[in-house]
Amino acid sequence: MSEEYEVTFIDRDERSARFLVRGVTPAFANGLRRAMIADVPTLSIDTLRVVENSSVMFDEQLALRLGLVPLTTPDDYEPGETVTLAIDVEGPATAYSGDLVSSDDKVQPADENIPIIELKDDQQLELEADATLGRGKDHAKHQGGVAVGYRHLQRVEVVGEKGEFEDDEPEILRGVIEEDGDLIETGEFDNDLSQRYPGKEVEVEEVPNAFVFDVETDGSMPVEELVLKAAESIAARADELEEAVAL
C-alpha cells in the first residue's frame, strides 16, 4: 500500500455508499471489508426481563427477534456499557420496533416499522431489555455493515472500429468504469459496453491498486462512520502487533 491513498465518493446517502479507493493493496481492501462487517461495535439487545407475555410466542423467540432490531449507536459508548429499552403493548395490535422506549434518546431503533409480534384480544407484551456493545465477529446481530463488497476499478479504452458485418454482442460489465479519467457507473448504459460504445472495439483492464466499494449499513450509524471506524480498528490492531513484536 502506498503512503498516500485517495478516496472518492461516487454515490452515497445515510445508509449506503459507493466509493473508490486508490493506492491500496488487495489485502488492505479485503481487510477493510472484513473490518466493516466484523470489527465495528454496535448496540444490540442482549438480555430481557419479561413482565408479561401472553402472546403466542415464547420469551426466547421474542429475545431473538428483539436482538436483531438495529439500534442507533452513539460513538461515545464504551464496551460494557448498557442501555435499557422498554415496551408495553396491549392487543389487538401489532408491536413494532418503534414501540420500544429507550432510556437514552441517542439510542433508538434504526427503523420504527419492524414488526415484533401480533397481539390478539386480551394479549399483552410488557418487558425491559438491555442492549450492549458487541462486534460482528462475536454475533451477527452486531454487524453494522450488512452488505459490504468491492471490486477492481475497470478502465475502458476504445482501440478501434468493429468490422462492417460484425454484430454488437452484449458485453456486460457491472460497477464503475474509468473512461478518460472520468468515473462512470455502468447502470447509465444498462451495464452493457456495446451500448456505451456501439460499433467500437474496446479494451478493458483493471486499474492497479484501485477498488470500488459498495457498502450498506443496518442504520446503526452513518456509512461514513462505519468506514472510518473500520479503518481505525485496522490501525489499532497494527499498533497492538507492533507493541507485541517490540517486547
From Swiss-Prot:
InterPro entries in UniProt: DNA-dir_RNA_pol_insert, DNA-dir_RNA_pol_RpoA/D/Rpb3, RBP11-like, RNAP_Rpo3/Rpb3/RPAC1, RNApol_insert_sf, Rpo3/RPB3_RNA_Pol_subunit
Keywords: Cytoplasm, DNA-directed RNA polymerase, Nucleotidyltransferase, Transcription, Transferase
Keyword Transcription in record: yes
Main localization category: cytoplasm
EC number: 2.7.7.6
Annotated family: Belongs to the archaeal Rpo3/eukaryotic RPB3 RNA polymerase subunit family.
Protein name: DNA-directed RNA polymerase subunit Rpo3
